Amino acid sequence: RKQEEKRMGRLLIIGCGGVAGVAIHKCCQNSKTFSEICIASRTKEKCDTLKKKLEATTDTKITTAQVDADKVEELVSLIRSYQPDAVLNVALPYQDLTIMEACLECKVDYIDTANYEPEDTDDPEWRAIYEKRCKEAGFTAYFDYSWQWAYRERFKEAGITALLGSGFDPGVTSVFTAYAMKHYFDQIDTIDILDCNGGDHGYPFATNFNPEINLREVSANGSYWENGHWVETEPMEIKREYNFPQVGEKDMYLLHHEEIESLAKNVPGVKRIRFFMTFGQSYLTHMKCLENVGMLSTSPINYEGREIVPIQFLKALLPDPASL
């Protein structure tokens, strides 16, 4: 018992890309909360490189491990070996469900930053459920919370917590809304979330997080919540200008985003929720050209006897967000 009280938080972090790197740095800046972390990824060398970079700057004890987050049995083995207080999933949204399954089996709390979406959007089993949801809900985005919210009772029965969407958007945006609702307003009628990125790092085309996920999200139909139902738009159909403090005036476009779904469920009486993100003309022109020639497709193609997914091939050519 004394040993348990002495040890602070032990966190297993799955993922070592751009978003993961930011989360890992932040954990290491808060050693009193995160006294021990294990960084695990399919490529252990990336974890080792980050560990080497950080360990002289923090009191947090850092270890690394190799794991394939697509395989529940590998995740279970790692969780049982490391015995964390919680698992932080900053891998790909494709892997949310396998990591949640492993946490359930090991009875360990779960945290993530983005909701589930499938890697293969042509999978017949997933497609049948997706098309039913499109008709019932009224939006066609590939990602939604239904898959993860379905775990609610199982997590409750296991006595563990799943904290979903704990990045900035979703995450901080939901906290801001809840705080405003509790401390400033009797009623919130409309919520507009504006996401602005003011830099390009000198590249004609780059994404600030995983290119595959980013481009799938941006090239899809937009949607917003109004008067109790979803309203869907064409990609980039709704454009607004906004003068952002310190950044200046930017063009922003309405997108579908996951916190619209959770806020609509948790903000009583809200009449409209929208999400906007800024994009420069160069980004949009590049994206449209890539889409027109099929490079944003998630469907596998055969190239000289090898099966490749165009958007995954494109990801390999673009700047790594972790390097920006």
Predicted regions and their residues:
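N-terminal Rossmann-fold NAD(P) dinucleotide-binding loop
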Residues: 20-24
